[in-house]
Every structure is written in C-alpha cells, then in structure tokens.
Amino acid sequence: MASPCLTKSDSGINGVDFTEKFRLEDSTLLANGQVVLTDVPVNVTLTSSPYLVDKDGVPLDVSAGSFIGFNLDGEPKSHHVASIGKLKNIRFMSIFRFKVWWTTHWVGSNGRDIENETQIIILDQSGSDSGPGSGSGRPYVLLLPLLEGSFRSSFQSGEDDDVAVCVESGSTEVTGSEFRQIVYVHAGDDPFKLVKDAMKVIRVHMNTFKLLEEKSPPGIVDKFGWCTWDAFYLTVNPDGVHKGVKCLVDGGCPPGLVLIDDGWQSIGHDSDGIDVEGMNITVAGEQMPCRLLKFEENHKFKDYVSPKDQNDVGMKAFVRDLKDEFSTVDYIYVWHALCGYWGGLRPEAPALPPSTIIRPELSPGLKLTMEDLAVDKIIETGIGFASPDLAKEFYEGLHSHLQNAGIDGVKVDVIHILEMLCQKYGGRVDLAKAYFKALTSSVNKHFNGNGVIASMEHCNDFMFLGTEAISLGRVGDDFWCTDPSGDPNGTFWLQGCHMVHCAYNSLWMGNFIQPDWDMFQSTHPCAEFHAASRAISGGPIYISDCVGKHDFDLLKRLVLPNGSILRCEYYALPTRDRLFEDPLHDGKTMLKIWNLNKYTGVIGAFNCQGGGWCRETRRNQCFSECVNTLTATTSPKDVEWNSGSSPISIANVEEFALFLSQSKKLLLSGLNDDLELTLEPFKFELITVSPVVTIEGNSVRFAPIGLVNMLNTSGAIRSLVYNDESVEVGVFGAGEFRVYASKKPVSCLIDGEVVEFGYEDSMVMVQVPWSGPDGLSSIQYLF
C-alpha cells in the first residue's frame, strides 16, 4: 500500500490549497465544523488524504477525506478493539456480516446500535430538509474500515456509544500496536457520489484492487441463465442438464448460460478409500465434510458418451454436444469452492497438490454471526488446505482441465474461508493476498480474466484484495425457497430479506463487482416479486427451476427469443430517502430502488416487511407484526439521473411520463410531484420514468416507454432520434411497444413498412415482431 503523508497542513499538500472537511478539535471529530464523533481518545490520530488524482490522473477532492489511526499502549497483539469516539443521535446506515459469508443492511443512531463485523457506515446529513448544496450543515459522512499492513479492520459497538474498531491479523504470530490509516472518512453532499469518490481514493491508496468501472463483467450478465442447484442439488447429471435446457428452449425461453452447480466433482469422505467417490450423497449438507479427490469430473459426467461418436466421452464431449444442439447456450459455468471443495482437498490424493487438514478458527466477531450449517460442518471436519505457495498449482490444475473441457467460467464459492485458516500463514491479509493472486492469475489465463461469479465473499478482505480481475459477484445471501429452520412463513419473509440484502449491499460492493442478485424459481409463491427485482437489478438473470416446472408466462417477461435479457445500464440501489430507513422490520417502510436504462429511469417499489435480523437471537427471523399493507410516495427525483457511466441529463426537462407496469397506467409528473403507491405484503410495482421532449416542428410532447410485455419495459429502447416532425426509436425485442405522445401520429412504420397502431390514453401502441437473429427493429412515428 502507498504510504500517505502523515502531516496535517492548512496550507495544503504539495502546494495545493484546500480547506479540510475533517478536523479533530477538543476531542471532537468535526465535518464541515459539525460534530461527527465526541470523546475521541487522545491516542487517535487524523491525517489528511494526500491523494491529488485518481488512477487515471483525474483530480480528486483532496479536502474531502482523511485517515484515522491510533497508537495502543502495551504489548503488541494480534487482535485489538479500540474506540475512535462516541456516536450519539446521528442516523446511520451500515453494512454488517450477519453470517460468516454474507452481509446486510442495518440502521441506528448511536454507537450502541452498531453491529459486529460492520464493513461500512454512512452518517446522515444534518437536517431532514437538507439537500445537495445545503452547505453549512453536517454533510453525509462515510466511515470505512481498511486493511493496513497485515491487519484488517471492522466496526462494532463499544462502551457507552463508542464506535469501536476491531483490528485483527488472524494469527497470534502477527502482532502490532500502531495504526495510521486503519479507517478512512469521507464527506460529501450526495450519498451515492460519496461512496464512489471514497473508493477512488482507496483505490489509489491500496492499489490492490480495481474498481468495477475499470473492468468488463462477463458476457453472462446479458444472458438468461439456468442453474442446476435447486433443480437437482447434488444429483446433477448430464441427462438431467440436457432435459432442463431442452425444456426451456421448447418453452420459448432458451438459456444463454448454463451453470452446473455443486455435484459434478469427484469427492469423498475421509473414511472412504481414496478411489471411492461419494456418489451416494444426495442431500444438501451431507457433502460438506467431503474433500476433492481429483481435478476431473465425477463418474456421472466422466461416463457421458456422445450420441454422435462413441469414442467422444466425458465432460468435454457433453459440453460440446450441449452447445452444438442448443445454439443459444453461449456459456457453461461450473461451481467450485475456493479451496476446491467444502472440505478442501483430500491430503493423500495423488492427483492434487499436497494439503494438510486445518481446523478453522472463528474470530470473536464471527462467533457472533448467525449459526450456519456450512460453518458447523467445516469446523467439525476441517479443511484440506494447500499452502499458499501451492495455490497457483492448484488453480492451474483445476482451471486448465475445465478450460480444456470447454467450460467458460466458474462460480467460486466459500470464499471467506481463508480468514479461519490463517494462523500459520502470516495472518488473514497475507494469506488472502497469496490465494487471490493465484486465483486472479488463473482466471486471467483460462477464463478471459472475468469468467467468474464470486460467492460467499462478503467481507472487505475480498473486496480490497480479490477484485483485481473478478468483476461479478453475489450481493445477497442465497435464494431460499423455504426457511431451512422450518418456519413456514419463511417462504415469504425470506424473500423480502433477499431484496434488502441485495439492494443495500450493492451500495458498497457495486464499486468492486457487478451485483448479482442470485437465482430464483419461477414457480415460487414470490416468483414475480423476485423477477421484478432481477429485471431492474442491472445484473444477470438466472433461475434454478426444476426440470419441466416453469412459469413461462413470467419468464417471457424477462427473456428474449435469443436467450438475451433487457439489462439496465447501471446497478440498482436504494432510493436516497430509503438509505437510513428499515424496510424489513419497522412495519412502515417500503423498499424503493432505482436504476437507469439508456434513455429512461426506472423505480422499483417492494413491500418487504416481515422478517430480518434479530440482535437478541443473533439470527434472521420472522417479525409477523411488521407484515402490513404499505403506502409510500415516489417521484422522478427518486432516480439518480447523474449516476453511472452514461448519466441522463434532465436539466431542461419539465415533465416526465411515468408508466406503471402492474396496472399499465400512464401518468404525467413534474420532477418533484409525488405519486402515491399502496402495496400489499410481498407485492411490487415497477415504474418507467421517461423524460418528455417537445418535438420542435409541431410541438408534440413525446416520451418513449418501451415493451410493456417485459418487466424492464424501457430496457428495450436502444436508440432515440428526434427530428422536426418525427421520432425514430430503435427497439430490441418483440411485443407491444408503447410511447407517450400528446397527439396521435399520422402514421407509424417498422423497418420502413407502414403498420397499424393504436392510440389510447395518450399512448401509441405498436406490435413489434422479432426481427432477424438479433431482434433489432426501428420504429418511426410521423406527426
């Protein structure tokens, strides 16, 4: 990591003048002169950020951020918990680890409200009516725990509203007592820009990761996918995969991605012979004590014989046959754990690198996370672990075999196991660096640098050290069809939890990886609820339906005939007025998320109330008293129009066309006009927000809406050209395309041919056929 200047100076750094936003005066941390933390201990230090430009040389707001550190008296240790001051009566939102592998959203107002293993905190600005440019009040403040040297940090509550920083190496052999840049604080008047600007500073400071904007997500993000997990669990086999793909193709929803999940590898129990595969393991959970025996696939896939050539066998033949038969299948991914399998490698396996059984050790913070079957099984049986100097050999062996078999990428699971195995390997930071470097090198060599879905990775170790190449990752806990603890209501409230996990986690993780909201099942009672969120998530869309059990009517609102999807330009985030609220168990707050398509905004409203984290029981549970019909308001200003790589200018826009997907109603609205929404439990509404433009030649007001048969309606709009007396819209997809027009057109043309159209409630309706192999059409509206 680069070493920042440790000297504060009112005259600036390197001759650049600035006024610092953060000051430490009289044991008080101030931002814009407003109190952030009080009773700051005397051993706490504040150092201005020295970084003048980002990695591209673009100037940074050098005054906006500072580093917090502290000196600790006494003998250096591997684990410290130190206060950086008291937080009192300031609303905050945070992201914390509720499981070893997964994080979620948490809100509060005082230091005592902070959860263990908190990865990020954002403090609200002062004054409920404050807004951008409010100036003199307290700005939004980001507090970000960092890595320093061989130590990693997180937040937790301390005594009497202290904000405590937990600093740990993970190994008693790695100790320290002085930290200079262990927390970064950043201030700004836009909470979304705040996080992005802060991450640009940390990108330069650490130089151990790349931001999402520097990378390209894999092509699977634009394809409809099918994952085998909930369809087969561990019984997945070539015949079943073939039948699953064929059923989707025959139903008009061909997948572009097939993800072969857990169940394809050669694994075994320690009690079995080294040549005995665990083929009788069929129940999820039974496989976790098993270890990898070899890089090659198990007999289910190894015994595959191509119907085209009896000599063509194994995974390679199966992959080739599947792609040859189903032309839309562009990508086949397979699952593997970071350490090979749930139980790691079998130490005596001759085809694998040498490994040693290590008993994982939970840190004090992890001991307070939710009980988890995977963690229990792993601790019970240990991990067959290849030392970090063998990690490159391990990934090369596994990934070279998969690439040779025609596999296009991997879902890497159980990523945050390393911190439990690091005692003898220099601590968690050094071990993570070694393993992630080896993984990155292999992915660059075998899977185009980006052919990875990261999973079970929700911790700052991975975000700061594992994302140099990886650009796609899960942002929520698993999609749970039912509650594994047996609560029948979990079929519903767990779905609300899933939405909130993904939406809020993306505010943090979306800076490093394209958010993946996970699979779902199209026949689940909350399937449409899930489908709506995936449609506007900005990430991949894939299902885990059992073979032959599909809701094709729903799927066709997500999937185009060529296996593509209508993906948003950005990634979905909570609306600004929901950042510091609790959409899971306050009984009143509706989740609202926003995203951008190429020419429009989109808002999603979801009633998620009914379950979530309980501090007392240390687990997610039902809060049935919070299940209510909710009413909320939304408006075009809920869309953050200036965000993303292609922001939409609304500087001269006076009116917006709002299209509600459920009722198919059109409303006209000003930027700040409120629209009231009422939603029953686990129901949703999607709203296309389209800026209205006046056509100069005839004063017709016009706004494109999109394909109303698709959940991401305006995602179908690929081009938009306004002429003096006409508008031309490029469309991707097929179905009923609508636009708002204040007057009825004289005629409509599709690809130069005059077509019939309808005009009702100020909407022009045209039926667009699927055009050619690429599904692109051009509609002209003549006025």
Swiss-Prot record:
Induction: By oxidative stress and cold treatment. The modification Phosphoserine is found at residues 9, 11. GO terms for cellular component: chloroplast. It catalyses: alpha-D-galactosyl-(1->3)-1D-myo-inositol + sucrose = raffinose + myo-inositol. One of its GO terms (biological process) is response to water deprivation. Gene3D superfamilies: Aldolase class I. The keyword tRNA processing does not apply. Disruption phenotype: Reduced drought tolerance, but no effect on freezing tolerance or on the ability to cold acclimation. The keyword Transmembrane does not apply. One of its GO terms (molecular function) is galactinol-sucrose galactosyltransferase activity. It holds the Pfam family Raffinose_syn. Keywords: Carbohydrate metabolism, Glycosyltransferase, Phosphoprotein, Transferase. Its EC number is 2.4.1.82. Transglycosidase operating by a ping-pong reaction mechanism. Involved in the synthesis of raffinose, a major soluble carbohydrate in seeds, roots and tubers. Belongs to the glycosyl hydrolases 36 family. This is Probable galactinol--sucrose galactosyltransferase 5. The gene is RFS5.
